[in-house]
Amino acid sequence: MIQKNYPTKQGFITYWINASKIPSKPWLVFLPGLTANHHLFKDQLEHFKGKANLLVWDPPSHGKSRPFDTTWTIGQLAEWLNNLLESESISNPVLVGQSMGGYISQAFMERFPRKTLAFISIDSAPLGRSHYRTWELWGLKHTFLVYIGLPWQLILWSGANGCAETAKGKLLMKRMMLDYRKMEYCKLVSHGYKELSREIEKNKTYRLECPTLLICGDKDRAGYTARYNQQWAKEESNPVCWVEGAGHNANSDNPTEVNLLIEAFLEQQHLI
């Protein structure tokens, strides 16, 4: 894969893409979660190499997509994603979003209907307002002081252990977090949560109108992700695939099972 940059007024978005495109194969577009980067999908990129065209980004203000003015909204992230894909002549992507990446995927599908070939959610949750209690949304807007008041080593420990269950998954998450200094991390995570809350409060209609695969770690303890997925599955009549022994970063905790689930789903949709 080759590294490229997409320019915006707020900074450059760094992404990685197939060195040579395969016209007969679908595009898998991998979107990491809040504070994570492209390394989160290392095992998926290796597994699907040659089976599909691949693109993964470091979200704005994350990883190599820095410096970047951290004033973006979820809607802007979706618009930049669309513009980036259009610049690469990618018209019908399969969006693979982990956590915040899944929210960006839904915002993309709402703003650009009928563009997405399929959606794979990994430990994400629905954007529909009905799934959230008022105090949960209030809490998402007031996290900065909570984070900044904690020692950096405690933030690193809680982030790694809260997102992953395996030693490999915890180490990966900690390494991604160490890409930031404490203040930068606290500003980024609190901004991401605040913008997520604001997007949910818009009370838009988010319907999954393309083939969808819901994946969630059976030990996901990040917020209320497990509960949200149960509600989401019921609302969409689309069962959740629970990944054994995996936490919030299910694709790094148990990449073998997640890769098999994704591959079986793509085969079922006659995409690979």
Predicted regions, residues:
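Active-site loop/oxyanion-hole signature of alpha/beta-hydrolase fold enzymes
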Residues: 55-96, 260
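Catalytic active-site module of serine/aspartate enzymes centered on a nucleophile-bearing elbow/loop
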Residues: 236-272
